[in-house]
Amino acid sequence: MQTIAAIAKLEEILTNNGISAQQALALLTTALPLATTSDPQEPLPPLLRALQTASDRLRQQQVGDTVTYVINRNINFTNICEQHCAFCAFRRDATASDAYWLNIETILSKVAEAVAQGATEICMQGGLNPAAKEGGSSLRYYQFLVREIKTAFPQIHLHAFSPQEIQFIAREDGCSYAQVIAALHEVGVDSMPGTAAEVLVDAVRSKICPEKIRTATWLEIVETAHRLGVWTTSTMLCGHIETPADQMAHLQHLQQLQQKALEHDYPARITEFILLPYVGELAPKAMRQWVGHHQPRLLPTLVLTAVARLFLGQWIVNHQPSWVKLGLRGATMALNWGCNDLGGTLMEEHITSVAGAQGGTGVSPEDLVAAIHSLGRTPQQRTTLYNPVGERQ
């Protein structure tokens, strides 16, 4: 405990602009069990209070008191998927009665609605549908989607297609990751979601998403995107079967990825880190049995949020909670544990909501602004790449 107490000293953390991987693991190993047995409504135990204070002060030191958000729309264009991830309640076989695959007219209508509501970003991802081809080519189909959207709405920032989707397209068409990313970037993909990361530890992936790309492939695709000038986000799926050591291995991979982008002076890098707590109310039975709880545990999520700021903050300065998974109240609490961004309005969300999330599928800019004001912070609308939109509010 003496080591943990030393780590928790606010002065040490602020002087060093963060903590080492060894210190972070020691904190997680001690703080997570404490958080699991503590009542979030009661006063925090001293260690958790010190952790919260340190992460909040480091956030203020690194990015200030402005809290950002983006007006965007999420479009999941198909739930047809060839994979069977243990945590996923979204995917369907093509023959399922509730399988869907949006046509381009519907997609463009959704984009038009978003633009009319002030959206600057469309986030678009979908299941891995082998039938999604244009002239026998997966890449041409994805290019068609992008080209149609950007032709009709050239002003919109298109944040689209995860590393898993990039690998899927490359496999289907027999081309390299670089060729796929470059071709999509050329027709209008502006940035890439850092999803499909789950936990970047193959022992975990082999159990919860055995058909997904391995850790090395995810890292290779994201680094390739940075090298080609495509910015990405980064994520972690937490609160299921992973251990504190797994969590730290994941954070170290992200830190090393960002460090490499900076050292090699790549034209793009990681814009933000988003912690995604597991929601499994309607997930497949095996995963629910492994995990033993169906909704996010708020205090352990906040502890990991804080440690992510302390370890990653000097490399990835923008940290975002998931209001879809935590609810807006929980996400607002995370702004006191190291986060400085509340994410997007989304307007619709299907992947988490069908798993039983209780946070909703869309939130208004006014609700985000009110949540930020409730903490005495200053709201600022932003672009996907964290440039300000309009005046501070």
Curated annotation (Swiss-Prot):
Its cofactor is [4Fe-4S] cluster. The keyword Protein biosynthesis does not apply. Consists of two subunits, CofG and CofH. Pfam families: CofH_C, Radical_SAM. This is 5-amino-6-(D-ribitylamino)uracil--L-tyrosine 4-hydroxyphenyl transferase. InterPro entries: Aldolase_TIM, CofH/MnqC-like_C, CofH_family, F420, FO_synthase_su2, rSAM. It comes from Thermosynechococcus vestitus (strain NIES-2133 / IAM M-273 / BP-1). Binds 1 [4Fe-4S] cluster. The cluster is coordinated with 3 cysteines and an exchangeable S-adenosyl-L-methionine. GO terms for molecular function: 4 iron, 4 sulfur cluster binding; 5-amino-6-(D-ribitylamino)uracil--L-tyrosine 4-hydroxyphenyl transferase activity; 7,8-didemethyl-8-hydroxy-5-deazariboflavin synthase activity; iron ion binding. The gene is cofH.
